């Protein structure tokens, strides 16, 4: 029995020493392993990149990089809150089969008016660039002056049909599977706020393309109860002991 107690205490100590890190991932950084010359997110976890306002009472040590892995992912062309952890319990909570953790995103869009049905079955379909006719005028362009086929870049909310907003909330399918209901609201005339409880590959970009929108900026700002807050792009902080997803 005494041997078991010793082992249990050692296990508890090892678990307590495992860190979870919150990173504001920049554009051009991949979440997992390095690929196509792009650096992985873990390469940013260095003392020089630690947020100076991080008040968690942890000291950085290279051993904290051992086994540190992303719990979920952000596309290379997305920014915002990315969780890296050594703790399997945290990983299961965030990306386990029955996780259902809320994730909140701010999504800047333009209205193309052209649905992209290929996005329903292929994440790669969202990589196609906008047509060269895309313009961002210094003042809002009167709708009557927009040529047919031109993307609308200003006051998208005013031209985006309400029934398509309803489809974003519920009614779309990806890869042959119906999506779970999502909370989708206009944050401002060019930006939507998405709250999802699932995470298919390039899900938001594909959802938008199915209803005639093109995503031109995507930032994750919340996972569960943990907010991105004022964490600067490219910097990181520790998840404090009192914080819970």
Where are these regions (language model features)?
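Basic, flexible Lys/Arg- and Gly-enriched helix-loop patches that mediate nucleic-acid binding at interfaces
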Residues: 1-245
């Amino acid at each position: 029995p005494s041997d078991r107690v010793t082992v249990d205490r050692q296990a508890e100590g090892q678990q307590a020493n495992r860190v979870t890190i919150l990173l504001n991932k920049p554009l051009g950084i991949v979440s997992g392993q390095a690929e196509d010359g792009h650096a992985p997110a873990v390469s940013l976890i260095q003392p020089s990149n630690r947020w100076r306002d991080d008040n968690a009472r942890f000291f950085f040590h290279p051993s904290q990089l051992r086994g540190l892995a992303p719990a979920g992912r952000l596309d290379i062309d997305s920014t915002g809150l990315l969780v890296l952890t050594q703790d399997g319990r945290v990983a299961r909570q965030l990306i386990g089969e029955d996780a259902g953790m809320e994730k909140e995103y701010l999504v800047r869009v333009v209205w193309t008016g052209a649905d992209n049905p290929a996005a329903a079955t292929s994440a790669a379909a969202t990589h196609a660039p906008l047509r060269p006719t895309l313009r961002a005028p210094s003042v809002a362009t009167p709708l009557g002056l927009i040529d047919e086929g031109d993307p609308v870049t200003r006051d998208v909310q005013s031209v985006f049909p309400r029934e398509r907003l309803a489809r974003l909330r519920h009614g779309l399918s990806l890869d042959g599977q119906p999506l779970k209901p999502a909370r989708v609201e206009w944050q401002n005339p060019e930006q939507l706020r998405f709250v999802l409880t699932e995470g298919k590959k390039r899900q938001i970009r594909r959802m938008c393309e199915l209803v005639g929108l093109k995503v031109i900026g995507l930032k994750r700002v919340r996972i569960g109860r943990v907010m991105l807050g004022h964490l600067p792009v490219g910097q990181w902080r520790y998840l404090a002991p009192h914080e819970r997803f």
